[in-house]
Swiss-Prot record:
Pathway: Secondary metabolite biosynthesis. NADP-dependent dehydrogenase; part of the gene cluster that mediates the biosynthesis of squalestatin S1 (SQS1, also known as zaragozic acid A), a heavily oxidized fungal polyketide that offers potent cholesterol lowering activity by targeting squalene synthase (SS). SQS1 is composed of a 2,8-dioxobicyclic[3.2.1]octane-3,4,5-tricarboxyclic acid core that is connected to two lipophilic polyketide arms. Keywords: Cytoplasm, NADP, Oxidoreductase. This is NADP-dependent dehydrogenase M3. The gene is M3. The active site is at residues 206, 210.
Length: 339
């Protein structure tokens, strides 16, 4: 059979190949200029504590006007809300559409109808499914009790609502955007987890929710041009020590146990990953794993997960990171443990 010279078929084959291969891998040697953040408006969900707080502070310190969307309560230490340049808290429940929509609308009024960056970092810890099923209170009946759904409500539904609103506003604000300076694209940054790729035993709701965040990101990353020509990336932090000032911390005993196998990263390692994604125009549709960096060099061991079909959907990168000791240990391989 003669080969076809149909140009449309050729274009379709090329689009399919591009889809399978993904965009260019992250070059961590490229210089990034934080000045591109100056004057931008950012929303950080879950930004009152932990990873979200670290990202909000970094954006603010680089000239961003930062709106933190979180439940009521003071921001972590280091934030002075009386300072006009500090992140501003907009109280809301990300799992409630009405609450989240109202918060986005308030931010748009506050910012003068400007929105350039949305970081989806709102999240809560898992429930252990073994504890829920096997460790029932004395005298409980044999009738199953409905398990809590807060992890799905916040981590997955809240992320979906937030991403939906971000894409909606990026699309509708595109006409008024001035891209002359720095050739800027709106930024949508998903916060997944290493649990989006690797099982975390018995953390059923958390793993399911974080796999869902990854699926949500992958469903829109190749079509971001439809939504205000935005840029979408995903961070997948390993276990992160966010104990300082955080209400989402783990007990020291649990930290020691989990870091026998996985190195414990710092919030600053995730912040470094966020700034790289937000400030580098060449990073688009990529997943970046945030791991423990070298001493005094946050983010220095972060790596591209290569989450594309032709690269085994990150499988090889994750396996290599364990084999090489970047994330932790595999089997009997040694690791440095807590640092």
């Amino acid at each position: 059979m003669a080969a076809t010279n149909d140009p449309e078929l050729t274009r379709r084959k090329q689009r399919q190949e591009d889809f399978l291969r993904g965009t260019s891998k992250i070059n961590f040697d490229d210089h990034i200029d934080h000045c591109v953040l100056s004057g931008k408006t950012a929303i950080v969900t879950g930004g009152a504590s932990g990873i979200g707080h670290g990202i909000a502070q970094a954006l603010s310190s680089n000239g961003c006007k930062v709106a933190v969307l979180d439940l009521s309560g003071p921001l972590e230490a280091g934030t002075d809300e009386s300072n006009i340049d500090s992140p501003k808290l907009f109280e809301c429940d990300v799992s409630s559409w009405e609450s989240l929509l109202a918060a986005f609308q308030e931010v748009l009024i506050w910012s003068g109808n400007s929105l350039d960056i949305v970081v989806l970092s709102a999240g809560v810890r898992s429930h252990n499914i073994k504890d829920l099923i096997l460790e029932r209170p004395a005298g409980s009946t044999s009738t199953p009790v409905k398990p809590p759904s807060s992890v799905f409500d916040v981590n997955l539904l809240g992320t979906y609502y937030s991403a939906y609103l971000a894409l909606w506003y990026f699309t509708n604000l595109e006409a008024k955007r001035d891209e002359a300076e720095f050739n800027w694209k709106p930024q949508l940054l998903f916060i997944g987890s290493l649990a989006s790729y690797v099982e975390q035993p018995l953390s059923a709701d958390y793993c399911a929710s974080k796999h869902g965040v990854r699926g949500l990101w992958k469903s829109v990353r190749s079509h971001s041009a439809l939504f205000g020509d935005c840029q979408t990336n995903l961070l997948a932090p390993t276990f992160i020590d966010n104990r300082q000032g955080s209400t989402k911390s783990r007990g020291d005993g649990a930290l020691i146990s989990l870091t026998n196998d996985v190195k414990l990263g710092e919030v600053s390692d995730v912040v470094a990953g966020a700034l790289r994604c937000l400030c580098d125009r060449n990073i688009e549709g990529r997943a970046l794993c945030c791991v423990k960096g070298e001493q005094s060099s946050p983010g220095s061991n972060n790596f591209d997960l290569c989450d594309n079909l032709i690269d085994f959907n990150a499988g090889k990168s994750v396996l290599d990171s364990f084999r090489n000791g970047v994330v932790g240990r595999l089997g009997t391989q040694n690791t440095t443990g807590p640092q």
